[in-house]
Design a protein with these regions (language model features):
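Bacterial N-terminal signal peptides that target proteins for export
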Residues: 2-12
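Short hydrophobic beta-strand that contains or immediately precedes a catalytic carboxylate
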Residues: 57, 67-72
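Glycine-rich nucleotide phosphate-binding loop and flanking beta-alpha elements
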Residues: 75
Length: 182
């Protein structure tokens, strides 16, 4: 009995793996905001916004032609810390010159957080709804997608979404700097 496999079997298996991976990574835009499982594959598009690559984000950053908005959540202080424990917020490294508006990328915002988001955008755009706003957080993070969608709903007309976020930025050896929330 021959143990030889048909010559087409290995290439066919390889194609099946590639097709399955591509299908798993293809994500449709939801009708509303993403409400859970924020660290997952994101859509390739955001209706009404421009999706930018790292190279495009770098050009915008160097030209100063967009306000960069980081929406990565700020980790809360653990409620069960032993008495006397000193809590230090984890350091956030983001794109130089950015404004960090933490927690504003969740799918549903409480009124106070919604007001904070609106005030933050008004501050970085000086009230100009035509000012380009670039939203980011981490790669495979729905927070920036939600925040960009929310900015569109608020009437901002030049919304950019950078899905690679600080992960893609750092991979290219571009600078990051420590940031505190606005």
């Amino acid at each position: 009995m021959s143990s030889a496999r048909p010559h087409w079997l290995l290439p066919a298996a390889y194609c099946l793996i590639l097709f399955t991976a591509a299908a798993a990574a293809a994500v449709d835009e939801p009708h509303g905001y993403r409400l859970d499982d924020f660290r997952a594959h994101t859509p390739a598009t955001l209706e009404g916004a421009t999706v930018v690559t790292t190279a495009e984000a770098e050009r915008l950053w160097r030209a100063g032609s967009a306000a960069f908005v980081d929406v990565l959540p700020k980790p809360p202080k653990p409620a069960n810390l032993p008495a006397g424990t000193i809590w230090r917020d984890p350091e956030r490294q983001d794109i130089p010159g950015s404004t960090w508006l933490p927690n504003t990328g969740f799918g549903a915002l409480q009124p106070a957080l919604e007001a904070y988001f609106q005030a933050g955008l008004t501050a970085v755009t000086q009230g100009d709804r035509n000012r380009a706003l670039l939203f980011y957080c981490l790669e495979r993070c729905w927070m920036s997608w939600n925040a960009a969608k929310r900015a569109l709903a608020l009437g901002y007309r030049r919304v950019l979404w950078y899905p690679e976020g600080t992960d893609g930025w750092a991979r290219q050896g571009l600078p990051l700097e420590r940031r505190a929330p606005r």
